[in-house]
Each structure stands twice: as structure tokens, then as C-alpha cells.
A protein has these predicted regions:
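Internal intein/HINT superfamily modules and their associated LAGLIDADG
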Residues: 1-156
Length: 156
């Protein structure tokens, strides 16, 4: 996986991105039906698949590019909004940073110690990929031990 080769991140940057994500970000963790064409015949097959992604959207291109350069995962997309705002002027261009699946796990593990508002969804993604509680016979996890483990994972 590409994120395993990343250098360790500055703790201040991780805390800043966590705050930015709490305020401006969105996280999707759901299972739903998708149409896929991965066969030689005609038509599609329906599959029940997970949708796991996270994104930050704003009109400040510099901040979005900094997030992308700092995390070294995901992609940046420019979105022009059509129509006019309430004042009758044009909407500003929106910039979006987005990542999904294992890259989202990597980012969630970085943000977990500092997240507040989106903490529950972040923990759902981490638990989806790393169900450490299932390794224990009684399904109980010591919260302090888990916090220490997750705080130390990606940092110096």
C-alpha cells in the first residue's frame, strides 16, 4: 500500500487537519447496492458493497492543496458551481480533497487522537479495517491502552 511508505507526520499538522476536518469535512461509511460490470456477458450484476470515503470541501485552494501535500494521499478536484448566489453574483469555485477505502483508514488513524465532532465515524472506519476487539476472547478493549496504541502509530 502506498501510505506505508509515507514519512511520519508532524503532530501539529495532524491536529490542525483534524480540526479542519471536524469543521469542513464529511465522512461516508455505509453499505449499499452498486451495479458492477465485471464479467464478459451483457448487463450488470448488483453487489452489496461498502462506501468508505472522506472529503474536505472549501473555496480556499491553498488549504486544500496543503492538506493533499501533507497527507500524501487522496486527490484534489476543482468544482465550478453553476447558477447565482442569493446576492446575484457567481458562486466561488469549490476545491475538494477526497480519499477512500484504505487511504481513508490511514487518514483516520492520523486524525483519531485529535478529532472531536467526527470521532464516532472515524472510529467506525478504523474498527472496520482493524477489528482488534475481535482478537480478544471476551471482546473487551481497555480504552486507555487502545488510545495509546492509536496515538503512537503514525508519529515520530
Amino acid at each position: 500500500m502506498k501510505h506505508l511508505r509515507k514519512k511520519k507526520m508532524n503532530i501539529n499538522d495532524a491536529a490542525y487537519i483534524a480540526g479542519l476536518f471536524d469543521g469542513e469535512g464529511s465522512l461516508q461509511y455505509k453499505k449499499g447496492w452498486e451495479k458492477k460490470k465485471k464479467h464478459t456477458g451483457e448487463g450488470y450484476r448488483k453487489t452489496h458493497a461498502w462506501r468508505i470515503n472522506m472529503e474536505i470541501a472549501m473555496t480556499d485552494e491553498g488549504v486544500i492543496n496543503w492538506v493533499h501535500e501533507t497527507l500524501k494521499v487522496g486527490s484534489v478536484i476543482k468544482r465550478n458551481v453553476k447558477g447565482l448566489n442569493k446576492a446575484g453574483g457567481k458562486y466561488k469555485t469549490q476545491w475538494r480533497w477526497r480519499c477512500s477505502f484504505r487511504d481513508a483508514l490511514y487518514v483516520c488513524k492520523l486524525l483519531w487522537p485529535y478529532a472531536q465532532v467526527k470521532l464516532h465515524k472515524i472510529e467506525q472506519i478504523i474498527d472496520h479495517y482493524e477489528p482488534r476487539a475481535q482478537e480478544l476472547g471476551d471482546n473487551v478493549v481497555d480504552l486507555e491502552t487502545e488510545r495509546e496504541y492509536r496515538k503512537q502509530w503514525p508519529f515520530k
